[in-house]
Swiss-Prot record:
Keyword rRNA-binding assigned: yes
GO molecular function: rRNA binding; structural constituent of ribosome
Protein family per UniProt: Belongs to the universal ribosomal protein uS7 family.
GO biological process: translation
Keyword Ribosomal protein applies: yes
Gene: rps7
Gene3D superfamilies: Ribosomal protein S7 domain
A GO CC term attached to the entry: small ribosomal subunit
Keywords, sorted A to Z: Ribonucleoprotein, Ribosomal protein, RNA-binding, rRNA-binding
A Pfam family of this chain: Ribosomal_S7
UniProt cross-references to SUPFAM superfamilies, sorted A to Z: Ribosomal protein S7
Protein name, as recorded: Small ribosomal subunit protein uS7
Lineage: Archaea, Methanobacteriati, Methanobacteriota, Stenosarchaea group, Methanomicrobia
Quaternary context: Part of the 30S ribosomal subunit.
Purpose of the protein: One of the primary rRNA binding proteins, it binds directly to 16S rRNA where it nucleates assembly of the head domain of the 30S subunit. Is located at the subunit interface close to the decoding center.
Amino acid sequence: MTEEAATSKILLFNKWDMSEVVVKDAGMVRYVTITSTEVPSSCGRLTQQQFTKSEMAIVERLINRLMQQEYNTGKKMMCTKMVMDAFDVINKKTKQNPLQVLVDAVANAGPREETVRLKYGGINVPKSVDSAPIRRVNTALRYIALATWKGSHKTKKPAYLVLADELIMAAKGDAKCFSVGKKEEVERIAKSAR
């Protein structure tokens, strides 16, 4: 690699190389977008059409999801700083690329099966259905953001530490973390509704 090519490589937050991140779940490859940008912000360009949010970088989608929780509403810089600090903590604890940890956490926290209500003769009957890959990603990000808010609300522990711990445990598939536990609960309910 030439010196010019090495210096022109774009790193996320000027620290993390996105080219070495691999999505291991084959169904989610199209919907977990890993683009090379320094600061993940599309400025709302990808919200004009229905399914274009799947082209948005996964880090930006996490930041946007964190912005939708209670007291973080609309505070993008605060949520971006939270994700940056969480990525630093993840790197110190696991010695891995935090983007890979995020991708693994999203793959492990998204439920593969859910239930819907069908109406048969005035009676609601739960029916098990497979989740679409984009819904799995959206649900996983929602669970991770909810776990971050619940873990840091009315406690002394900062939100970035809660986010880092949640991502590390979800990447390992640990059922003690909120997002994986919630996924297993949804899948258990779906299994009983088959």
